[in-house]
Amino acid sequence: MPMHSPALPMLHLMRLVSPSQPVGAFSYSRGLEWAVHAGTVTNEESCAGWVFGLLEHSYAVLDGAIFWRMISALMRNDDAEFCRLNDWLGASRESSELELEDRRMGESLRTLLSELGVERARSFASEQRATYPAAFSIAACHWNIEPVDALRGLMWSVVESQIMAAIRLVPLGHTAGQRILIAGAAKIERAVEKARTLNDDEIGNTAPALAMASAWHETQYSRLFRS
């Protein structure tokens, strides 16, 4: 394949969203483990409701919307705005576990990118702990991934990670997990459109169930996941 092939950015995106990416995503459930323990998520239907509810009311209006602005800031070489957005997103996590998950995955990806020779990841201020969307946006810009495709990839990776956790926790069969992912394709596209069209004063939303599930998970007696 020619090095300038237009397919290369998409192939890099596929690698970025792959579950084999060494960022530790398999260790986290984002409160889903408590939701299963509490009987809120018990089957395929309730799992889909939980995952897609958070996609619409939390990830799209916070992570996705800020990620969209991060990409724009990087393309303008506006490092100050990029750092401001990273701080904003990091400060928006509603529990210590959610913040720790985001920072650990973000720093893992940033470190990986640095080792792969991505200069922007290397130059990210040492005192500035990268959120995962920030590190993802650096990767997307480096490999010339179209911003809207990068946003789709980020939203897809969030949903897929939740489904993989649900397969272990509920438990769901793998076929049920695939049914949820197939049904989620159109929902992800709507989340992408919502994230990229929000005004600044519309960014952010309260997801009480996520916040409480994550906080309760911190003292849950028996746990498979870190969040």
Curated annotation (Swiss-Prot):
Keyword Chaperone in record: yes
rRNA processing in keyword set: no
Keywords, ordered alphabetically: Chaperone, Cytoplasm, Nickel insertion
Subcellular location(s) per record: Cytoplasm
GO terms of molecular function: nickel cation binding
InterPro entries linked: UreF, UreF_sf
GO cellular component terms listed in the entry, alphabetical order: cytoplasm
PANTHER family on file: UREASE ACCESSORY PROTEIN F
Function of the protein: Required for maturation of urease via the functional incorporation of the urease nickel metallocenter.
HAMAP family given in the database record: UreF
Subunit relationships: UreD, UreF and UreG form a complex that acts as a GTP-hydrolysis-dependent molecular chaperone, activating the urease apoprotein by helping to assemble the nickel containing metallocenter of UreC. The UreE protein probably delivers the nickel.
Family per similarity comment: Belongs to the UreF family.
Protein name as catalogued: Urease accessory protein UreF 2
Source organism: Brucella anthropi (strain ATCC 49188 / DSM 6882 / CCUG 24695 / JCM 21032 / LMG 3331 / NBRC 15819 / NCTC 12168 / Alc 37) (Ochrobactrum anthropi)
Lineage: Bacteria, Pseudomonadati, Pseudomonadota, Alphaproteobacteria, Hyphomicrobiales
